[in-house]
């Protein structure tokens, strides 16, 4: 099998491909896969992942890392909005600036674009009127389960899965929100530039941790030579 990543843009301009199976099959298909795949710095975004279901396993872990990445962005947004009192436009400007540095990535780029998007009916920032529920297809949960089965830590990924689970429990959250007063940040004096720099560095460090945690189960599985990735 083969993991495929890229979404709509990947379909139009080339995806990232993670093939698994026999080496002979990969070698036979490699010219075609490299031709249709995305390119980064002149290199095809495709490589042999290993035997059997290795390609799908790597794609699963890729999704788990993405779960963590999106949750870290959501946590950063929460602090920007509720602690620093930033508007959607101010946040968009900040994310755009961050995307020019070491945080440059697709998710950071589209975060800025999303924050600039206005709801056509109300004129309000779209992010303020959409349903605050994030569902999941299961790949993040499977990544956490695999890490637990292997005995390797993946706390950032796992907490991102739990955050989505809590997000989907809308009715329960509404009940609890009536029992607990909102955290009162009003009147709290903060050094916005300093806090934003702390947020940027914290987000960068957290990203590194999430990637390391994703590589953990992949590396550990590879070292267990008596098993193939499809056994997990």
Question: What does each of the following model-derived ranges do?
Answer:
Residues 95-98, 160-166, 230:
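A glycine-rich phosphate-binding loop feature that marks nucleotide/adenosyl-phosphate handling sites
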